[in-house]
């Protein structure tokens, strides 16, 4: 069964986020992120964009402090594609270009979500961000699997 909390409101798959993976999978990854951001390991936690709360990650512009989430909440919207400014939004375009560098097409993802193909999309993303060696979930930005240490091959 897929976890719908991992449907990012901008079209990003939250299951590939380093914060989410550290919180769910790896105490050592959680500790290294905590050290980097001068936090306690307990503060490195997130259940995905659909489940943000006061205990969620909030360092910088991520998680509960995400400007996209705040914008959508202020407009009473769930996803970027619902906004009348979606096609011309500078914030979205900037984020989409960053995501494109790791092989993520936010517009394609949002099109699948809009078409009601959320579960199909979540299954595809889960498979895409899984280590080919140990079959465990990994993060977008890791070069090696945090489970088995295998160099990750990405389908971009």
Question: What are these language model-derived features?
Answer:
Residues 119-137:
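Ferredoxin-like iron-sulfur electron-transfer modules
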Residues 88, 149-156:
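Short Cys/His-rich micro-motifs in 6-15 aa windows
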Residues 135-138, 152-154:
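Active-site beta->alpha loop and helix N-cap motifs at the rims of alpha/beta catalytic domains
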Residues 46, 80, 131-134, 145-148:
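Short cysteine-rich clusters marking metal-coordination/redox-active sites
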Residues 86, 118-124, 144:
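Broad hydrophobic/π-residue packing in well-ordered secondary structure
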Residues 1-81, 85-114:
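Hydrophobic scaffolds flanking metal-cofactor catalytic centers in soluble metalloenzymes
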């Amino acid at each position: 069964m897929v976890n719908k909390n991992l449907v990012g409101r901008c079209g990003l798959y939250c299951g590939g986020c380093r914060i989410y993976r550290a919180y769910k999978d790896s105490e050592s990854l959680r500790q290294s992120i905590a050290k980097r951001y001068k936090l306690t390991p307990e503060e490195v936690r997130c259940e995905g964009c659909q489940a943000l709360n006061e205990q969620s990650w909030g360092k910088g512009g991520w998680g509960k402090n995400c400007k996209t989430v705040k914008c959508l909440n202020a407009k009473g919207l769930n996803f970027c594609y619902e906004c009348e400014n979606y096609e011309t939004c500078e914030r979205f375009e900037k984020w989409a270009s960053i995501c494109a560098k790791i092989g993520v097409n936010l517009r394609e993802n949002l099109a699948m979500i809009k078409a009601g193909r959320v579960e199909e999309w979540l299954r595809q993303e889960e498979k895409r961000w899984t280590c080919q060696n140990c079959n465990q979930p990994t993060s977008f930005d890791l070069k090696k699997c945090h489970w088995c240490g295998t160099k990750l091959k990405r389908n971009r």
